[in-house]
Structure formats: structure tokens, C-alpha cells
């Protein structure tokens, strides 16, 4: 089969799959025993590409930080130091004692699962391929770019405080808890921005005053069990187009971050939330804080549930301009990026990350 004919076959298979609007769960419900070709990672890829240092006992672990430890001035300084080290060296860390009740964490995971396990005809009412739709269900929003497809279904929900969704726009299966959880996440986002601001050696309100906390996109994933997990990925490697991402994952696991050229498991910690530095944060901090590639491995167990909340100023019409923070610049540390708007950055983001290229690098001076 020629390369051209193989691509035509792939596109036809992709079109047939998307037209069902049943997602990956729909495939699994048919009791398939093999992963369709449109999900296969290239044969040249490997899921076990850790370096020897990882194999011979380096024991890399993503930092776990207790946000309840900053009750005194001295303790706050220690907490900020831990945040700084994690943001600079890992771009990832987990937080405990973050203020969101465990019951709310449980409820949002249950709500996400309820929606994805709804009658397919109910879910189809929310099916959309436009990432800008305020509430949308799909299997891979990046179907025009992503090859191969990822082994997951998702729904997105924009819960911007300035332009919130009307309750009736959210499916009943997850309506109340989406609204409740987004409020808690925005409060936590405010605290994290204070800590990150202080970690930069700046006023604690600088990130908030830059309007970095105006928007919230919830991306709620459902990873069905996979019969051949070594042939595909839950999510391909990528970075996030956010300032920070606040992620809730269940206990199944599969999330990995690239650190020192090794894929490191972000092992689930009961009650914890995963915080990752996004591309916008790396840009405005002039590479002081790092947005790191991460991915999700497919798993025979499942379904796996995760809720990723992208804290940003939103992708809808927004003229706010962002560039490296002036207080961080000097003759020895000049600006490494040009000023941009969030919508400008978002254009082409999906095409870049799933092509294995850094979108952020396109804006370097």
C-alpha cells in the first residue's frame, strides 16, 4: 500500500469512527479485542523510552507540596521556596491540603463519569468538533491534526467568571458539581498565583493584576479500558496553553511528565491535585518557570477519570497583551519572547503540539 493510499484508508476509517459520535467508549462497548489502526502510535515510537539513569535506581518523584504549611511568615517562605524549586525544575508538582473538600473531588469525578456513561443519544446532543463551543463533547477535539487518535473521550466546559455558562447549558448529569467545582478551583488558582508571584520575588498580586485568572476551561476526560495499551496513548505528549493547569486524577494512574529526558509517573496521591506550569506562564516568566511535556498512557484498567482545569484569560475575543514581566528583565536577562495575545497563541496550537513541535518556540525573539 502506498503512503497516499494508506492515508486515504486512515481518513475513511477516521470519518467512519467520528460519524458514530459514540467515542472510544462506543468502541469498547462493542467488546473489541484489538485497537483500530487510527489509534496506533507509529512503530518507530516507544512507550518505554526511559533513560538508563531512570532504570538504575534514580527514583525520580514529582514533588508533593503541602499548602497547609504556610501559616507563619517563616513557614510561608519555606512553602514559596518549594513552589519555586518545583516550577523551575519540574514544571509539575502535586498539592495536598489545598482547601477543596474531598467530597467535592469525589462528586466531580462521579459527575464526569455519569456524563460519559450516559445513553449515547443523550451525549450526541452535545457533540461538537469546535473547541470554542461553551460545552462540547467529543472523543478527540484535535481530529484534524492528531495522528494517531488518542484513547479517550472528553467534554469541555468554559466557566469563565466574567461570562459564566447558564446552568441549563450544562448536562444534568454533571451540572451542579461542575458549577461547584469550578468555584473551588478559581479560589485555589488565586492562592497558587500568589505563591507563584512570591516565588518570582514579586508582589503577591502581580499575576492576578495581569488578568491571568480571568478564565477557566474544564476538560473532563474519560479513558476506557484499552485491550492493547502498548499500541496507543491516552493523550499524546504535549504542553498546555494555560498559565497553570489544575488536574484532578483518579487512582488508576497513567499521567507522565518528561523530566531529565525520562518519562516520570505522576503517581496518584489520594486527595491531591496536580499542578502544571503552562506555556503562558513560561512566556511571562521569561523561561524562569517551565512548561513541560506530559502524556497519558493507555491502560487495561478503567475507566480512568481526570478533570483538567486550564487557568487562563480565555480564548474568546480578548485584546490583553502578554509578554515577559518587566520586573524580571535586565541587560543580563533580556526578553526571550515577543508580546502576544491569548487568541493569537491559540491559533495553530493544536496543529503544533501534535506535530511534535513546540508552539511556544514560534514566539521567541
From Swiss-Prot:
MF GO annotations: 1-aminocyclopropane-1-carboxylate oxidase activity; dioxygenase activity; metal ion binding
- Which key words are in the record? Iron, Metal-binding, Oxidoreductase
Which cofactor does the UniProt annotation name? Fe(2+)
Q: An example of a Gene Ontology BP annotation on this entry?
A: biosynthetic process
> What are the Fe2OG dioxygenase domain coordinates in residue numbering?
214-313
What highest taxon heads this organism's lineage? Eukaryota
Q: InterPro entries this protein is in? A: DIOX_N, IPNS-like_FE2OG_OXY, IPNS-like_sf, Oxoglu/Fe-dep_dioxygenase_dom
Q: What class of enzyme is it?
A: oxidoreductase
Please share the entry's free-text remark on the cofactor: Binds 1 Fe(2+) ion per subunit.
Catalytic activity, EC: 1.14.-.-
Pfam families per UniProt: 2OG-FeII_Oxy, DIOX_N
Binding of Fe cation: at which residues? 238, 240, 294
SUPFAM superfamilies in alphabetical order: Clavaminate synthase-like
Positions annotated to bind 2-oxoglutarate: 304
The record's comment on protein family reads: Belongs to the iron/ascorbate-dependent oxidoreductase family.
Q: Mind telling me what this protein is named? A: 1-aminocyclopropane-1-carboxylate oxidase homolog 9
User: Organism, per UniProt?
Assistant: Arabidopsis thaliana
